[in-house]
């Protein structure tokens, strides 16, 4: 049986996979986490909502609702899915084809690859976004989801797990290198950030 998680448990368990996947991609860890929660969450038998509880995530390890598309050569899973028109009306896409993965980690990696491979997301400004809210709005413009409130929902979900995302999933900034050299009887210590300290030799 597939595992399910609270929102914070999900970030803790897959934080390292998320960090590796987003590093250098222009995709914010908070955006990825919030999308995974929204797309995979479902109601458990005890009435609580769990990440990984949706049929698509349980049966196909698809945590991001990514459809097959013509470029996909892997396994697939078909299921009905609800869509929303710009005017707010809804309709059901019957027997829609979704990507199927061997693991949640594979789903996380393919999410990043999917966004990078599709030029419409670059044109929409996804990879230039400086905040989760801004990136979510760009994803909506790029056609990732049809729900009119998608960007607001992503940002709200992110804020609920922000501390965990920053602790477990966000790429760590590299520390500056220590540089030592002597000049006029002083030892200059550079920390690789354009800042230097002068220390007189004893």
Predicted regions, residues:
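Short, Lys/Arg-enriched, disordered terminal segments
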Residues: 1-4, 200-202
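Catalytic cores of secreted/periplasmic lytic hydrolases that degrade extracellular macromolecules
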Residues: 2-174
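Single-pass alpha-helical membrane anchors
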Residues: 172-202
């Amino acid at each position: 049986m597939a595992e399910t998680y609270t929102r914070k448990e999900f970030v803790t368990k897959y934080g390292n996979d998320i960090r590796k996947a987003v590093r250098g991609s222009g995709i914010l860890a908070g955006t990825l986490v919030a999308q995974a929660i929204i797309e995979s969450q479902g109601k458990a038998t005890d009435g609580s909502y769990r990440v990984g509880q949706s049929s698509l995530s349980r049966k196909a390890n698809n945590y991001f609702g990514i459809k097959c598309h013509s470029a996909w050569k892997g396994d697939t899973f078909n299921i009905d899915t609800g869509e929303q028109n710009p005017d707010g009306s809804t309709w059901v896409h019957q027997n829609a084809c979704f990507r199927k993965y061997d693991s949640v980690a594979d789903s996380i990696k393919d999410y990043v690859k999917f966004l990078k491979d599709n030029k419409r997301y670059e044109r929409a400004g996804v990879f230039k976004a400086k905040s989760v809210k801004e990136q979510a709005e760009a994803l909506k413009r790029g056609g990732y989801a049809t729900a009119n409130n998608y960007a607001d929902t992503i940002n709200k979900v992110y804020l609920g797990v922000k501390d965990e995302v920053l602790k477990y999933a966000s790429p760590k900034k590299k520390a500056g290198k220590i540089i030592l050299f002597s000049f006029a009887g002083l030892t200059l210590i550079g920390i690789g950030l354009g800042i230097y300290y002068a220390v007189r030799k004893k």
